[in-house]
């Protein structure tokens, strides 16, 4: 190894020291290196800016999609009911818009809130199955085709179909779903009172689910307690709903059909004094109009034009007899 080291040393002595480059060349090299370095820095900054702009653009795009999606991709309102009667004034307030007055035969759509004042009542028809009536001072929102949100006043619902249309009424105290029935939902401060005239309802609140049947009045307290009472189908408290019933067109209907309508609206049952009286009611076609009359007043007016009359019987019955009976 020592010999090798000597040879290397001799070789270096022969070559001599490396010549230093001229000063001008050193300055040119340094300037070129500095320029290249600055170019690299600028390229990196440009890439970072592109990345930042890309991220910002993505964020703006996401916000835009969310905004316009919420505005333009939300479900469109759907017409779900038609106004069949207004006694006084009925206001409708579409979501995000000012209120306007409604008229009979106009429609109500999902997302709209309808309201009666302290002197007005109204009736709506949901499809072919459900009659909805609003008492005085009622505010209700049509949340969807099968859900109403009641914040003030009272609703009366009459569903006559064998397979009733689904409909849920929600209040602060709980919700009510019917199973083919006639019933009323009324708000009292934070309470909810459900009166069942016919059929059955299901009531749900924070405490659980319970049912109500015909003849029951169920009060749901803010604590979720259920307090039960009784109410007759012909009780005077139902009078407001009967007086707000959609107008019944008697033309070309038999007297028997009209009597059944009166019975349903007043919570009574029709009984005939004889088979002859029943046959006469089934065969008699009616003509005329009862517009503006409540069911009881209309009954008296119609019977006065026939050979039949109403006889005195129990409060829950409508007794019909021939004048000759």
Label the predicted regions:
Residues 2-32:
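A short, acidic loop/turn at secondary-structure junctions
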Residues 13, 45-47, 303:
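Class I S-adenosyl-L-methionine
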Residues 24-37, 48-83:
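Single-pass transmembrane signal-anchor helices and their membrane-water interface zones
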Residues 66-325:
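A residue-level detector for the "anchor" residue at the start of short, highly conserved motifs
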């Amino acid at each position: 190894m020592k010999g090798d080291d000597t040879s290397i040393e001799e070789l270096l002595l022969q070559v001599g020291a490396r010549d230093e480059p001229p000063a001008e060349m050193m300055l040119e090299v340094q300037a070129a290196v500095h320029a290249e370095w600055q170019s690299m820095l600028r390229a990196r900054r440009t890439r970072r800016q592109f990345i930042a702009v890309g991220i910002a653009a993505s964020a703006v795009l996401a916000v835009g999609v969310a905004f316009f999606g919420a505005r333009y991709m939300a479900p469109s309102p759907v017409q779900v009911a038609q106004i069949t009667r207004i006694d006084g004034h009925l206001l409708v307030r579409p979501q995000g818009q000012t209120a306007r007055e409604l008229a009979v035969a106009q429609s109500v759509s999902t997302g709209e809130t309808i309201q009666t004042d302290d002197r007005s009542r109204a009736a709506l028809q949901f499809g072919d199955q459900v009659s909805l009536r609003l008492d005085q001072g009622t505010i209700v929102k049509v949340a969807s085709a099968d859900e109403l949100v009641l914040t003030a006043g009272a609703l009366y619902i009459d569903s006559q179909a064998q397979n009733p249309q689904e409909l849920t009424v929600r209040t602060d105290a709980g919700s009510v779903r019917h199973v083919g029935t006639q019933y009323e939902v009324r708000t009292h401060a934070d309470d909810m009172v459900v009166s069942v005239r016919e059929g059955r309802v299901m009531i749900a609140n924070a405490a659980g689910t319970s049912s109500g049947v015909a003849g029951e009045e169920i009060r749901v307290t803010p604590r979720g307690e259920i307090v039960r009472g009784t109410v007759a189908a012909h009780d005077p408290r139902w009078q407001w709903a009967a007086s707000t019933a959609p107008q019944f067109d008697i033309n070309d209907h038999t007297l028997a059909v009209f009597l059944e309508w009166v019975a349903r609206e007043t919570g009574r049952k029709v009984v005939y004094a004889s088979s002859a009286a029943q046959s006469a009611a089934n065969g008699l076609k009616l003509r005329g109009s009862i517009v503006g009359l409540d069911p009881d007043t209309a009954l008296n007016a119609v019977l006065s034009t026939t050979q039949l009359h109403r006889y005195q019987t129990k409060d829950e019955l409508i007794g019909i007899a021939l004048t000759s009976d």
